[in-house]
Regions:
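Catalytic cores of alpha/beta
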Residues: 11-18, 65-73, 93, 111-121, ...
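Alpha-helix-loop-beta-strand connector modules within alpha/beta enzyme cores
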Residues: 40-54, 74, 91-104, 140-160, ...
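Conserved, mostly hydrophobic/aromatic
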Residues: 28, 82, 118, 174, ...
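Glycine-rich beta-to-alpha transition loops that act as phosphate-gripper elements at the mouths
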Residues: 6-8, 60-64, 84-88, 106-113, ...
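Active-site beta->alpha loop and helix N-cap motifs at the rims of alpha/beta catalytic domains
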Residues: 1-14, 19-22, 26-96, 130
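Glycine-rich phosphate-binding active-site loops on the catalytic face of alpha/beta enzymes
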Residues: 29-32, 108, 125-136, 177-198
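Glycine-enriched alpha-helix->loop->beta-strand junction motifs that scaffold or abut catalytic
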Residues: 20-24, 51, 76-79, 96-105, ...
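C-terminal alpha-helical cap/extension of soluble enzyme domains
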Residues: 151-221
């Protein structure tokens, strides 16, 4: 499974990208607005840092506007994926953009029916938001399971890109059910690296090594 970061912060991206664990980036207008600089400059800088897919979202709400924005965004870098919302106008834009050879990530997917429609319209990625479903008492991972089954049953080309991830367990569950990609905030990826037994084990190794050095040094005197 590919692991993406859901952020537009270049510092965080560079830090984690150096570890060789970042396959791509997803952004949205909220994340972009938190960073200094112009929208396209931020996306261009991210695309230079990360060689994998970088999703950049349109802000238009009509299909013509989405197509126009999407075509402009696609010229920023070859690894840009145009992100559009799962609304009727978004489906129209997805059909037009994909027909023009531009890859599309359909976002804000909250049902398998929406995901199926997005895939049929030509989306390269379908993004279910599991954390937000959990927030309203539904089990978000059931949606991922349904989308994976539909993808496999009909050999759809759209990849299941799981978003709205809140904790490492979400990532593990997405991997176990066969999602193609999980995108997460940097802090979730950092939490995935740690375990208290790892920290305790390392401390013990280092403490034992220091004791051994002191013993050897005192014995040599």
């Amino acid at each position: 499974m590919k692991l993406f970061l859901d952020t537009a912060n270049l510092g965080q991206i560079k830090k984690l990208n150096q570890m060789g664990v970042v396959d791509g980036i997803t952004t949205n207008p909220t994340l972009i607005a938190k960073e200094p600089g112009e929208f396209e400059e931020i996306v261009r800088a991210i695309c230079s840092e990360v060689k994998g897919d970088v999703s950049a979202e349109v802000v238009a709400t009509d299909s013509d506007g989405m197509v126009s924005e999407g075509k402009r965004l696609s010229t920023i870098a070859p690894n840009v994926v145009v992100k559009v919302p799962m609304i009727p106008e978004g489906l129209r834009a997805t059909k037009s953009l994909s027909a023009a050879g531009i890859r599309v990530n359909v976002t804000l997917v909250f049902s398998a029916n929406q995901g199926l429609l997005a895939a049929k319209a030509g989306a390269s990625f379908v993004s279910p938001f599991i954390g937000r479903l959990d927030d309203i008492g539904q089990r978000g991972m059931e949606l991922v399971e349904d989308l994976v089954k539909v993808r496999d049953n009909y050999r759809l080309k759209a990849e299941v890109l799981v978003g709205s991830i809140r904790h490492p367990q979400h990532v593990l569950e997405a991997a176990k059910v066969g999602a193609d990609i999980a995108t997460m905030p940097p802090e979730v990826m950092e939490k995935m690296m740690h375990h208290p037994l790892t920290d305790a084990g390392l401390k013990r190794f280092l403490d034992d090594w220091e004791k051994a050095k002191k013993t050897r040094a005192s014995g040599a005197v």
